[in-house]
């Protein structure tokens, strides 16, 4: 028998808090939870409050709440008024001066949701890092989640920071996001931007890879269970392989002539494609924030202007973009009092 002689290690307040935060419970808290739960709760609560009660009349000249007759698709928490610039719009700041009603009217809820939402997403990413470390696995889930964080921060924070004010960010609502997409197309020709193309390829490519992978696994399952359905056919602690990688490799080698040789390369590729797509699209949005242009084929525009019989899909799209700008600006920015005479509005074969 071995007897260890020594003193108990002194445990401070930090150790006690650490033990409590990492205690095994139904919903893990952890140190990341101190950031995640309050910010996510406040962001979600702010959005539900805004879409239910708060008007956008004072910022956009629009009705945007359930109280005013909107539905789930048309309700939104709209961006602050253009005159607010890039103010954080703190409730106790010089704009609202502690008046909650006025704070809602000038768009304070949008800034509240955007900032708390960003920190909530970061907290969720840190949560995945923390749990991965405790469980003893690699942190690739957290690395993958950096993609959505990059998109959110670039679209809702960095883009309006590069523009005149928070007004030009997307409002938090379904139809409001669609309006923002039309704005990006009309004012930035976003669909022809190579970073947008890479983003689309990444997201749709990731969906395709996911569908192919799921179907292939289902096709090559080992039938070593006698249960009634797939979900009960295997035990959680089984030591055997669930599906045949060799059979899957043979199948796709016959289909395409090439196939993934091992599971590591296959699953890394499934991680790499969509995350890279998200990051490239986020980089593209930062470029739009700086008003950078991409793929302006001026020679085609000049020839189309000189030759009425020459038109390409590109020149047609440019004409459509001009229409979006001319007709959208007056509606989208009523505070500017834009007036476009009929003779300056674009006209062409497509309009």
Swiss-Prot record:
GO terms for biological process: photosynthetic electron transport in photosystem II. Fe cation binds at residues 213, 267. Keywords: Chlorophyll, Chloroplast, Chromophore, Electron transport, Iron, Magnesium, Membrane, Metal-binding, Oxidoreductase, Photosynthesis, Photosystem II, Plastid, Thylakoid, Transmembrane, Transmembrane helix, Transport. Its EC number is 1.10.3.9. It is a multi-pass membrane protein. GO terms for molecular function: chlorophyll binding; electron transporter, transferring electrons within the cyclic electron transport pathway of photosynthesis activity; iron ion binding; oxidoreductase activity. It is found in: Plastid, Chloroplast thylakoid membrane. GO terms for cellular component: chloroplast thylakoid membrane; photosystem II. Chlorophyll a PD2 binds at residue 196. Disulfide bonds: none annotated. Its main location: plastid. The keyword Translocase does not apply. The chain crosses the membrane at residues 39-59, 123-139, 151-164, 206-226, 277-293. Pheophytin a binds at residues 128, 141. Chlorophyll a ChlzD2 binds at residue 116. The keyword ATP-binding does not apply. A plastoquinone binds at residues 213, 260. Photosystem II (PSII) is a light-driven water:plastoquinone oxidoreductase that uses light energy to abstract electrons from H(2)O, generating O(2) and a proton gradient subsequently used for ATP formation. It consists of a core antenna complex that captures photons, and an electron transfer chain that converts photonic excitation into a charge separation. The D1/D2 (PsbA/PsbD) reaction center heterodimer binds P680, the primary electron donor of PSII as well as several subsequent electron acceptors. D2 is needed for assembly of a stable PSII complex. PSII is composed of 1 copy each of membrane proteins PsbA, PsbB, PsbC, PsbD, PsbE, PsbF, PsbH, PsbI, PsbJ, PsbK, PsbL, PsbM, PsbT, PsbX, PsbY, PsbZ, Psb30/Ycf12, at least 3 peripheral proteins of the oxygen-evolving complex and a large number of cofactors. It forms dimeric complexes. 2 of the reaction center chlorophylls (ChlD1 and ChlD2) are entirely coordinated by water. This is Photosystem II D2 protein. It comes from Trieres chinensis (Marine centric diatom). The lineage of its organism: Eukaryota, Sar, Stramenopiles, Ochrophyta, Bacillariophyta. The gene is psbD.
